[in-house]
Amino acid sequence: MKDAMDSRERDALRNISASCLCAKARKAARAVTRFYDRHFAGTDLEPGQFTILVGIRLTEPVPTARLAEHLGLDRTTFTRNLGVLERDGLVAIERGEDARQRLISLTAEGRRRLKAAIPRWEQAQQAAISTLGKENFSDLAAALSLPAEFNKSE
């Protein structure tokens, strides 16, 4: 049996559907991920893995906790993704001076795959700029940095 919906509830639901930042961000993230997935086809790397490898390469050896924070990933997601990269022989994980610390570096295979994927990333960036226009691309990239502020205020 279908419940009747009063106008207040209908208005609230329409407002949610039209303006929910979370829903819009998730939808946008899926669209961007599919876009980059197409450009990364044939690289043996997913865009998320590529991003992790870039973060490692820039600061290696990097403590796992620092990299996870830099990438904005929760511990569970980061650990799962890192496990796949380690299993595939792309990263090496060693103990730091403090036995509790784990340091991540790229293996030779990880560096090779990262290097091979960079042209695909460059193509994806250019395609995104062509699709959105340079100004919209820049505005979107800047706007996507803003949600990090949510975590600073908690």
Show where each model-derived region lies:
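C-terminal regulatory/oligomerization modules of transcriptional regulators
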Residues: 1-14, 119, 130, 134-154
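Short hydrophobic/aromatic-rich motifs at helix boundaries and adjacent loops
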Residues: 4-11, 21-24, 35-37, 54, ...
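N-terminal helix-turn-helix DNA-binding core of bacterial DNA-binding proteins
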Residues: 15-19, 23-26, 30-77, 103
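Alpha-helical linker/hinge and terminal dimerization helices associated
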Residues: 28, 32-35, 39, 71, ...
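Alpha-helical structural elements of signaling/regulatory helical domains
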Residues: 45, 62, 77, 116, ...
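Charged, amphipathic alpha-helical coiled-coil/dimerization segments
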Residues: 61, 83-145
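DNA-binding alpha-helical recognition surfaces that contact promoter or target DNA
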Residues: 80
